[in-house]
């Protein structure tokens, strides 16, 4: 694969995190990147864009045509959705390029569940759960790391010099609390507070940074990924990275997660009642967040849900008590006791987690996985 064409939303405020990570990785492994617009200013040079628009280059000149979820559906900070149709080039008859859709949408039932998305060669879906129905062309994917995350955590303090803090300070998130976080705030946070100091410090997201480059990124990311946040990560030993919702084990296609209304409410109540008699574990929906990847990159001891137990699927899975600590509401005491019994275990897991995420989820690593998966599919007709 030599060239990739991205379809991006031409809006400086529209943070297309999927494009940033993948395009940076593709460029790092020698793949040229073009697009329908200039996207993601990388420096204070107004000509320095990650994705470049060249009117001489069209999708027909490239090996892959990639549509960002930010193109079809973008949600601003007002939490209103702005929709656009799938570009004609995605399904053009006689095309010689492969097509991919990057789906980072929250929730279970994302836009890419619609029938027209089956025409993409592949849909790379974050928040994938193998114990739920997922359309046939969806491929498990991950948010991974951006070069900025790696750079801002590169000088993280050695373990022994860090504060014995656990960060529980979700910031750039939804205007509501994830039910999974609320659950673990009851079952996990009071218990882990006996082992680490709970740090709830947050940034003021309404206050733009003074540094011009930081301000540029502040504006392009809808106020995410601040330098001060990475500094806190880099001097803290542990992070709480719980996210999403633990849904009942049935049904296989949980329609009650597809929206509000009376039908969804009744469906949820029915299957919640049924789950009392269902021995299968619950399923973790919308689990993926930047917090998990950022904390691993910073060399922190990361606490999250027990990912495979709840059905989470990634291109490369982390191993519990090797790369992170995966817990369930009912076994928090056991996990913390295991940590306490081995004084060096927390540091080892943090170190191994950092090495694991750099090996498999750096931009270049994700780009190689993307290219390999896309090229393994049948050639376009």
Regions found by a protein language model. Give the residues of each.
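Alpha-helical elements of Rossmann-like donor-binding domains used by nucleotide-donor carbohydrate transfer enzymes
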Residues: 21, 85, 183, 331-338, ...
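Nucleotide-sugar donor-binding catalytic core of glycosyltransferases
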Residues: 2-90, 94-316, 320
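Conserved short C-terminal alpha-helix that flanks the catalytic cleft of nucleotide-sugar-dependent
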Residues: 339-342, 346, 350, 354-364, ...
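Conserved binding/recognition cores within well-folded domains
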Residues: 381
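Hydrophobic, well-ordered secondary-structure elements that form the walls
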Residues: 295, 324, 353
């Amino acid at each position: 694969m030599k060239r990739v064409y991205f379809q991006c939303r031409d809006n400086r405020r529209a943070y297309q995190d999927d494009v940033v990570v993948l395009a940076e990785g593709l460029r790092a492994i020698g793949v040229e990147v073009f697009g329908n617009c200039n996207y993601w200013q990388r420096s204070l040079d107004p000509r320095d864009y990650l994705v470049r628009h060249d009117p001489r280059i069209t999708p027909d000149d490239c090996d892959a045509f990639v549509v960002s979820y930010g193109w079809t559906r973008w949600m601003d900070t007002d939490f209103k959705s702005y929709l656009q149709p799938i570009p004609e080039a995605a399904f053009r008859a006689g095309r010689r390029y492969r097509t991919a859709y990057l789906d980072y949408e929250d929730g279970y039932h994302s836009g890419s569940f619609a029938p027209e998305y089956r025409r993409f060669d592949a849909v790379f879906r974050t928040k994938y759960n193998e114990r739920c129905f997922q359309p046939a062309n969806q491929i498990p994917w991950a948010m991974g790391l951006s070069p900025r995350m790696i750079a801002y955590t590169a000088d993280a303090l050695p373990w022994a010099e860090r504060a014995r803090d656990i960060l529980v300070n979700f910031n750039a998130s939804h205007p509501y609390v994830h039910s999974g976080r609320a659950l673990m705030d009851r079952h996990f946070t009071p218990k882990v507070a006996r082992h680490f100091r709970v740090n709830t410090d947050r940034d003021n997201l309404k206050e733009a940074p003074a540094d011009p480059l930081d301000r540029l990124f502040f504006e392009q990311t809808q106020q995410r990924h601040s330098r001060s946040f990475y500094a806190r990560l880099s001097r803290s030993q542990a992070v709480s990275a719980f996210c999403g919702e633990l849904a009942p084990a049935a049904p296989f296609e949980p329609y009650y997660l597809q929206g509000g209304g009376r039908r969804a409410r009744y469906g949820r109540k029915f299957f919640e009642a049924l789950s009392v008699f269902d021995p299968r574990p619950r399923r973790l929906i919308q689990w993926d967040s930047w917090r998990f990847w950022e904390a691993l990159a910073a060399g922190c001891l990361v606490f999250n849900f027990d990912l495979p137990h709840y059905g989470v699927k990634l291109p490369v899975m982390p191993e519990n008590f090797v790369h992170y600590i995966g817990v369930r509401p009912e076994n928090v005491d056991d996990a913390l006791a295991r940590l306490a019994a081995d004084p060096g275990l927390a540091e080892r897991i943090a170190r191994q987690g950092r090495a694991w995420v750099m090996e498999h989820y750096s931009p270049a690593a994700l780009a190689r996985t993307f290219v390999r998966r896309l090229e393994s599919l049948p050639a376009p007709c």
